[in-house]
Amino acid sequence: MTSTFHPANGSFEFLDSTGYNRIPIVSWLKSNAQEGLGHAHKAGELVTLLGGHPSLKIGALLETEKHDIGDILRESLEHENGALAAYYDLLKISEGNSVLLEEFAREMLVQEELHLDEVNKMLRRPGEIEPFKE
C-alpha cells in the first residue's frame, strides 16, 4: 500500500487498497461489519424485551463516494464517534432505571472505544504516537 503525507494540512492519504496490507485490512473491515450486526441483534433483542418492535430501517449512511483506505478509515472514525455518543446517551438514560440496559451500554462503550482506538492508530503516520486529528 502506498501513502502520502501532506505537511501543509497534516493529512495522511492512503492511495490504494492493494499490496501487502490489503488482506488484513479487508479482513478487519469484514470483522467489524460482522460485529456491528451482532450489536444490532443485541439491541433488537433489548427493544423486544422492553415491549417494542425493532425497526428494520437503516439509518443515514456515511458514504463519501471515496474509496481509498484513508477515506474509509475516516468514515469509520466518524461512525465510531457517533456510536460512542449514542451509547453514552443510553447509559445516561438507563442509569438507575435498568441494570440490563446499563450493562449493555457499558459493554458497547468498551467495544466502541477499542474500535475508535484501532481506527485512530491506523490513521496515524508510521512512527507517529500522537492521536490522529483531522
State what each model feature region is:
Residues 1-134:
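Iron-associated oxidoreductase/ferritin-like identity signal
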